[in-house]
Amino acid sequence: MKRLLIYFTIVISSFSYSQKKALVGGTLIDGYGNTPITDSVILIDGDIITGVGTIETLSIPDSYEIISTEGMSVLPGLWDMHVHLMINGHSDYGYWDRTYPELFQDVIMPSSAHQLLMAGVTSARDLGGPLQESINVRDKINSGEIPGPTMYVSGPFIQKKPYPGTELFRWGVDGEKDARKKIRILADAGVDCIKLIDQDQMTYEELSAIVDEAHKHNLKVIAHSHRPEEIRLGLKAGIDNFEHTGLSSAPRYPDDVIEMINERTAQMNIGPLFWTPTIEGLYNYTDLIDSNEHLDNESWHLGLPDSIITDIKNSIKKPGELPYFQLTPIRKPTLKTKFNQLRDAGVVMLIGTDSGIPMKFHSQSTWNELDVWVNVMGVDPLDAIKSATYWPSFFMGVDNKVGTISVGKQADIIAVKGNVLKYISLLQNVSFVMKKGEVVKR
């Protein structure tokens, strides 16, 4: 116990708890996509940004602790809009769901959250998890009891019928009345959004009732887009945000689906249509087969007991033989076409990763998604960063509080050595993380 207390004393003393801080010298990327500011100065009082300028234009009061960001890119804390805290990269969902539910709340989900935060993710959306555990972990993070990003949680997946053995985190609906009831239960419990899957197996009346009831409770609805009919019905019902680059190995989205998306994005009066393509896991899978060194990166061990680490390692010893990914090499050539179809149709893209699924570790997924967007899909780095900062905050309705480095907003800020606009992959080594004005990594 004495050694443990000494350890925590050392850790705590290594962080700064001064209420007034100045980040000085780095190149500031504000999250809006504006021209970066060199030799920047950011003033923070408590958890709020109180000044943004340059060394020449903004004076630093004597009472402020100066933190040098010279030679660094400084940007808003990242968002990941599609994570699964309840899983940590194990390849066998059925086994995991049977073995670890009792550890979800106190071990596994906190571990996932901590890994995300250390990777520079200061806000994240958890889509599909056990209801009370999701809310409890979110609230413990918000109260400062455990480290992690500010979490926005959906609670259970809503679908026509839960898969056998998944009833803890998948809820079925049986008719319009039951659909509304399930959404009211989730709303009353305090979820932040609603997550649908397999909505093409529902009746349109059930789907429409879900969306209508969610919107009555000011909850956005996020839905899968694996199959054309999921998209068609979802657009008709008013889904706010689609997930994944779907349609398996089909070479492109059907013309009628793209036309429906065009019609939806043309309606400025109801706001943007959002899409989270979660493309990196599909694109990089074949590289993992040839070189799986990232599986040996110990960053994903953070917070997990040795027994679970060993269990995960054993499950992914042969990445080329995992049933989950057998179609992935065939899907890879279709990804860029589909990604560009969606962009050309006017959807607003969001950075999300599906982190937690087999071999997709919370500590590594977000930067990899950004890297594929920029270096494979051809997205401008400033636009990619905006999709990981401003746009997620806008979608979740908190853009007045977070998402950009602006006066009056919460001080969620990260910094990395070097120029991320030239080398976006530098985000794999985030040097500095500030959440709500507190330095949590330095």
What is each residue range found by the language model?
Residues 1-20:
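Bacterial Sec-dependent N-terminal signal peptides
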Residues 28, 32-75:
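Histidine-rich, glycine-flanked metal-binding segment
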Residues 196-331, 357, 377-378, 396, ...:
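Active-site core of metal-dependent hydrolases
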Residues 109-132, 149-156, 188-199, 220, ...:
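Divalent metal-dependent hydrolysis catalytic cores, especially in the metallo-beta-lactamase
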Residues 72-140, 164, 205, 226-244:
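Metal-associated gating/positioning segment near the N- to mid-region
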Residues 85-104, 158-177, 246-252, 321-327:
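Acidic/histidine-rich helix-loop elements
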Residues 216, 319-323, 332-419:
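His/Asp/Glu-enriched, well-ordered alpha-helical/loop segment
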Residues 26, 42, 47, 71, ...:
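Divalent metal-coordination and catalytic microenvironments
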